Amino acid sequence: MIEHNPTTIYGTTIVTVRKDGKVVIAGDGQVSLGNTVMKGNARKVRRIGKGNVIAGFAGATADAFTLLERLEAKLEQYPDQLMRASVELAKDWRTDRYLRKLEAMMLVADSKATLALTGTGDVLEPEQGVMAIGSGGNYALAAARALIETDKSAEEIARKAMNIAADICIYTNHNIIVESLDAQ
């Protein structure tokens, strides 16, 4: 049996789907401290920049907000260039002593690109327009990949994937927040 540190904040699930001219990021609202649900309606998916980028985060909340702020600063420096801003953030993440200790991951998307920014400073693009992170990420990813070839919309796929993850992962709930953008 796996022992969990009761003072560590665990889990969330974030999924992104890009399909048929839409890009969606969805996330649940649960915040757990050890084996206790501390909050069920946290907002882990939001619009950043000028509202033309959506982001979802998993991991330590304070760390995630630090990274969101840094990404917003990079987007101001490189307007309408999500890939460039993300790569520049990743460079900082890998070289800055303070940032290297941050324990968070993010999925970000604009009309042109969907990216995962990992805790090791990697910038990854999804296969098949689908990617997921967090404690229920593998469940959401499997569900979304199974549904991507159906006639369901990007939002329907993301919601179904999140509900499946919430049914399986104890650190994920059914309070799902969705943000979407028109995609190229």
From Swiss-Prot:
Catalyzed reactions per annotation:
ATP-dependent cleavage of peptide bonds with broad specificity
Q: Which SUPFAM superfamilies match?
A: N-terminal nucleophile aminohydrolases (Ntn hydrolases)
Task: Name the keywords, alphabetized.
Answer: Allosteric enzyme, Cytoplasm, Hydrolase, Metal-binding, Protease, Sodium, Stress response, Threonine protease
Summarize what activates or inhibits it: Allosterically activated by HslU binding.
Q: Which GO terms describe its molecular function?
A: metal ion binding; threonine-type endopeptidase activity
GO cellular component, as recorded: HslUV protease complex; proteasome core complex
Q: Which Gene3D superfamilies does the UniProt entry name for this protein?
A: Glutamine Phosphoribosylpyrophosphate, subunit 1, domain 1 (3.60.20.10)
Enzyme's top EC category: hydrolase
Known EC number: 3.4.25.2
Pfam families in the cross-refs: Proteasome (PF00227)
Q: Which residues form the active site?
A: T12
Q: Which family does it belong to?
A: Belongs to the peptidase T1B family. HslV subfamily.
What name has this protein been given in UniProt? ATP-dependent protease subunit HslV
Q: Which organism is it from?
A: Brucella ovis (strain ATCC 25840 / 63/290 / NCTC 10512)
